[in-house]
Amino acid sequence: MAGKRALVILAKGAEEMETVIPVDVMRRAGIAVTVAGLAGKEPVQCSREVMICPDSSLEDAHKQGPYDVVLLPGGLLGAQNLSESPAVKEVLKDQEGRKGLIAAICAGPTALLAHGIAYGSTVTTHPGAKDKMMAGDHYKYSEARVQKDGNVITSRGPGTSFEFALTIVEELMGAEVAAQVKAPLILKD
């Protein structure tokens, strides 16, 4: 199962934990993760003023695809920036078209709505993004901490970041690898 690749799209205002925890957990599982800056390779200021340095620009990272999963962190401003980006739309449409995994957390799923991705799926979001996500009846809503429906994995917020990341690992690498990664993290069951 070696050779799995992930693309995490980092926009100004992204939620730090929802970015770093999935990146860390996926890398622990042996997934090659590229953190791509929406606005280029310059450091990105996140929602709590933490700066994260992308590995690549989104433009360059997209050329290096395809990826096994494309992940969208949350954060209100971050999700808004993802939602307004034609480049994000192109990446998501490509991923959906090839039936690749798409993962989004917190307010991140609102970018799926903005770009017309995975209509008809059951999703979850941060409670504060629920009304926006459900406008137009394009999705079914779940209160689950992590929701998987077909090739779409969504989650609720910073406190669900580990579960979200481990669900992605299990999907890409299998339950055994997910369990091996989880054990030393000392997570509460």
From Swiss-Prot:
Its EC number is 3.1.2.-, 3.5.1.-, 3.5.1.124. Sumoylated on Lys-130 by pias2 or pias4; which is essential for cell-growth promoting activity and transforming activity. Undergoes cleavage of a C-terminal peptide and subsequent activation of protease activity in response to oxidative stress. Larval brain and gut from 96 hours post-fertilization (hpf). Ubiquitous in adult; most abundant in brain, eye, heart and muscle. Within brain, neuronal expression is widespread, particularly in the cerebellum, medullary reticular formation and diencephalon. Expressed in major forebrain and diencephalic dopaminergic cell groups. InterPro entries: Class_I_gatase-like (IPR029062), DJ-1 (IPR006287), DJ-1/PfpI (IPR002818), Prot/Nucl_acid_deglycase (IPR050325). There is a cross-link at K130 (Glycyl lysine isopeptide (Lys-Gly) (interchain with G-Cter in SUMO)). Deglycase activity does not require glutathione as a cofactor, however, glycated glutathione constitutes a PARK7 substrate. Keywords: Acetylation, Autophagy, Cell membrane, Chaperone, Copper, Cytoplasm, Endoplasmic reticulum, Fertilization, Hydrolase, Inflammatory response, Isopeptide bond, Lipoprotein, Membrane, Mitochondrion, Nucleus, Oxidation, Palmitate, Phosphoprotein, Protease, RNA-binding, Stress response, Tumor suppressor, Ubl conjugation, Zymogen. It comes from the Eukaryota. The modification Phosphotyrosine is found at Y67. The keyword Lipoprotein applies. It is found in: Cell membrane; Cytoplasm; Nucleus; Membrane raft. The modification N6-succinyllysine is found at K182. Pfam families: DJ-1_PfpI (PF01965). GO terms for molecular function: glyoxalase (glycolic acid-forming) activity; mRNA binding; oxidoreductase activity, acting on peroxide as acceptor; peptidase activity; protein homodimerization activity. A lipid is attached at C46, C53, C106 (S-palmitoyl cysteine). SUPFAM superfamilies: Class I glutamine amidotransferase-like. Homodimer. PANTHER family: PARKINSON DISEASE PROTEIN 7 HOMOLOG, PROTEIN/NUCLEIC ACID DEGLYCASE DJ-1-RELATED. Belongs to the peptidase C56 family. Multifunctional protein with controversial molecular function which plays an important role in cell protection against oxidative stress and cell death acting as oxidative stress sensor and redox-sensitive chaperone and protease. It is involved in neuroprotective mechanisms like the stabilization of NFE2L2 and PINK1 proteins, male fertility as a positive regulator of androgen signaling pathway as well as cell growth and transformation through, for instance, the modulation of NF-kappa-B signaling pathway. NCBIfam families: not_thiJ. This is Parkinson disease protein 7 homolog. The lineage of its organism: Eukaryota, Metazoa, Chordata, Craniata, Vertebrata.
